[in-house]
Regions:
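Conserved alphaE helix
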Residues: 130-144
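ATP-binding glycine-rich loop module of kinase domains
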Residues: 18-89, 93
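Conserved structural core of kinase catalytic domains
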Residues: 92-134
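Short, glycine/acidic-enriched loop or turn micro-motifs at the edges of active sites
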Residues: 115, 157, 175
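C-lobe/activation-segment region of protein kinase-like
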Residues: 163-199
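Regulatory N- and C-terminal appendages and interdomain linkers associated
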Residues: 1-15, 23
Length: 199
C-alpha cells in the first residue's frame, strides 16, 4: 500500500490512519554545493535529497537554508513561507524552523518534513469529522492572513496536512500571488466546506 493512504479495516471499526511523510515542495537544486555546509551544521545529509518537486510520497526530504539558496525561483517562495509563518496563529504553523550551528549562532531557516495525512486523503476516506476539524483550523488561519492582505493562492486539499503531532499545516503558498487570488482562496474554502459537509 502506498505511503499516505489509510489502512481500511474489514470490520466495522473506523479505518486506522497510516502515517505518511510530506514536505513543503520547496527544496533546493544546489545540493552538491549545500551538502558540506549542512554537514557542518550537524544535519544528517543522508536523509536530505536535493531536488525540486520531489514526489509526494518520497522518503524524508530536507530543504536548503534560505541564505544559501541562489535560485531566483526558490527564494521568493521560501520568503513567502517565512512571511506567512509570522502571521498564522501559533497553533497552525507553517513548516519553517530556525537552524543554529553547533555554537548556537542563528544560521537561517530550514523547512521541516512532516508526518501526517492530507485533507484530500481524509475526504477520500470519508473521515469527514476529522476533515471538518482540520478545515476549521485552515479557515481561521486564512482569515488572519487575509486580514493582513496576505494570500496563500493554492488552498487545495493536498496542501493541508493533518500532522501526526496534532498540528494543521499549510503547504506551498504561491511565490507571487495576485491580489485577486484572495477570492480564489475563499472559493476553494467554500468548495472544501461542501466536500466535508460543513454547510
Amino acid at each position: 500500500m502506498p505511503l499516505g493512504m489509510f489502512r481500511r479495516s474489514s470490520s466495522s471499526n473506523p479505518p486506522e490512519r497510516r502515517s505518511s511523510i510530506h514536505v513543503v515542495e520547496i527544496v533546493v537544486a544546489e545540493g552538491a554545493e549545500l551538502k558540506p555546509r549542512l554537514l557542518e551544521q550537524g544535519l544528517d545529509c543522508d536523509e536530505i535529497v536535493f531536488k525540486y518537486h520531489w514526489p509526494r510520497y518520497a522518503p524524508p526530504v530536507g530543504s536548503g537554508i534560505r541564505s544559501l539558496v541562489k535560485s531566483e525561483h526558490l527564494r521568493p517562495q521560501f520568503d513567502r513561507v517565512v512571511e506567512m509563518h509570522a502571521l498564522v496563529p501559533s497553533s497552525i504553523p507553517l513548516p519553517v524552523a530556525p537552524v543554529r550551528n553547533p555554537d548556537g549562532d542563528f544560521v537561517g531557516y530550514i523547512l521541516e518534513y512532516i508526518e501526517g495525512v492530507t485533507l484530500h486523503e481524509l475526504i477520500a476516506d470519508r473521515m469527514l469529522a476529522e476533515a471538518r476539524r482540520q478545515l476549521d483550523r485552515v479557515v481561521q488561519a486564512v482569515e488572519k492572513l487575509h486580514a493582513k492582505s496576505v494570500v496563500h493562492g493554492d488552498l487545495n486539499p493536498a496542501n493541508v496536512i493533518a500532522a501526526d503531532d496534532g498540528r494543521t499545516v499549510l503547504l506551498d503558498p504561491l511565490p507571487f500571488p495576485k491580489p485577486q487570488m484572495k477570492l480564489q482562496d475563499e472559493l476553494l474554502l467554500e468548495d472544501l466546506r461542501r466536500q466535508v459537509g460543513a454547510q
